[in-house]
Amino acid sequence: LGALKDFKILGIPFFKGYSAPKIGFNESFSFIYEFGEHANNQQSDTLGREKLTKSNELYTSPYHVGSGLFYLDQYLGKNILEESLREFASSNGKEPFKSILENKSNKNLNWFFNDYISDREAFDLHIKNTLKNKTTTSITISEKNGRKLPFKLDFIKNDSIVKEQWYFHSGKDSTYKLKRGKYDYVAINSNRYLPEKNRHNN
């Protein structure tokens, strides 16, 4: 994604000084945020430096934003995020980052800007119910606080992902009918790209 150090991207002043390659975007950073969240120390990513605790300023918030950007990149696909970051950089931040993304994609982005980076409460998706027959598996998915967001359903066989499918959760309990196939089970965001409050029910 390139260096972001000179831009107040997403309206987050303290993002200056961090770069996407340095952050790394792997599951360890989601773990760092989740550790702070479980300790009830998490804060909104849009707060100014002076309002953040030192641990949130230095570790939790930057890694949370990094994980979120990577998750957003996976959701949008087609290099949309990378192209949008380059355009944002070339405009010296004059055009809102959200507007640039919306011009390149028709997908819902409110979940990211209104909830992910602005709300201190972590998402909490979980599989509420499963019903199987000979040809299909129906799963009901819920989000604890009724929030809307995209999620990736992973089809897993022998502990490896054999298929991935993106869905957009409406905020209400939703049932998805899946064809039975060559997989052992399904899981929500099994690669930990999206920080969550509780992963044991995914």
Annotate the PLM regions:
Residues 103-105, 143-145, 196:
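Extracellular acidic, Ser/Thr/Pro-rich low-complexity tracts
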Residues 160, 190-201:
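Short acidic/polar inter-strand loop motif in beta-rich domains
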Residues 79-91, 167, 173-177, 192-195:
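Compositionally biased, low-hydrophobicity segments enriched in charged and small polar residues
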Residues 83-87, 152-155, 166-168, 199-202:
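Composition- and surface-driven signal marking solvent-exposed, interaction-prone regions
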Residues 1-140:
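Hydrophobic alpha-helical and helix-loop surface patches within well-folded domains
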Residues 109-110, 130-190:
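Beta-strand-rich binding/interaction modules
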